[in-house]
């Protein structure tokens, strides 16, 4: 992967009305972010969007955007990335469910109308997920595995997938993982009940879902975006009704040029662990 230059960073103030989320948010997390923003008085890191048909599909930062909307702001600072280019990688998070009795989980899932829970052979899970022939796979603690199936177009399926996740979200601990290998997960989460594994989405899926006003469950899509702009610390007053977007973006251009000129923009290509979010 080539090295990014600071001049390639695309930052812009845009209207919140033009920002289209593709995933659900968590009201509890939104409330927490509202408190943090009110306390700090600035937006630390801009949400990430892809520009499409004069709209902005939100790839990362749904909680921040929902918080700003709930606070009554008109605009938001975003970082715009090329969703069709090689620099953005769309992957998936799987959900580790902890503390919910497996029998209760299965019974509750069976009660979701229009969802089919079908037992499958353990050797077919990867194949089904890669081929995107299922909406999800359920891997129980004892190794029993099930396919989650439903009918309809992609927006219909997302509505049902959100209902599936609602069965356990808020009723058990839910942790994100990049794999569904049970032995190491049980070692990490001794009270693991099950793992819900999801197929990878395509960027075209995310765009279609956002444009149609549908939502993917929170914590499923995983966008890997090198060159994220962090630590801008833009005052919240810049998200308000005045001045115009043109004036805000002129101010932003001057700010970015000044920080580049003063060597205050640095690229860290190595992976890092963040403990304060």
Explain the meaning of each model-derived region.
Residues 98-159:
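Internal, conserved structured core segments that host functional sites
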Residues 1-55, 59, 63-83, 87-98, ...:
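Short, charged/polar connector segments at secondary-structure boundaries
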């Amino acid at each position: 992967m080539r090295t990014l230059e600071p001049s390639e960073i695309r930052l812009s103030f845009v209207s919140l009305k033009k920002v289209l989320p593709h995933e659900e948010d968590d009201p509890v997390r939104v409330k927490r972010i509202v408190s943090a923003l009110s306390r700090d008085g600035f937006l630390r890191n801009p949400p990430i969007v892809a520009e499409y048909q004069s709209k902005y599909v939100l790839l990362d930062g749904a909680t921040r955007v929902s918080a700003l909307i709930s606070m009554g702001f008109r605009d938001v600072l975003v970082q715009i990335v090329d969703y069709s280019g090689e620099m953005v990688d769309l992957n998936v998070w799987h959900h580790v469910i902890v503390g919910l009795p497996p029998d209760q989980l299965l019974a509750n899932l069976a009660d979701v109308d229009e969802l089919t829970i079908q037992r499958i052979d353990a050797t077919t899970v990867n194949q089904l997920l890669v081929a995107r022939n299922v909406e999800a796979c359920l891997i129980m603690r004892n190794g029993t595995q099930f396919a989650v199936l439903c009918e309809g177009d992609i927006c219909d399926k997302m509505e049902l997938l959100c209902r599936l996740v609602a069965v356990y979200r808020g009723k058990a601990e839910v942790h994100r993982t990049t794999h569904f290998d049970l032995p190491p997960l049980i070692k990490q989460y001794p009270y693991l009940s099950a793992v819900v594994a999801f197929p990878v989405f395509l960027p075209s899926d995310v765009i279609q879902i956002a444009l149609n006003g549908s939502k993917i469950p929170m914590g499923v899509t995983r966008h890997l975006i090198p060159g994220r702009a962090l630590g801008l610390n833009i005052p919240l007053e810049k998200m308000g009704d005045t001045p115009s977007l043109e004036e805000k973006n002129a101010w932003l251009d001057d700010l970015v040029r000044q920080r580049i000129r003063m060597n205050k923009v640095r690229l860290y290509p190595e992976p890092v662990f963040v403990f304060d979010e």
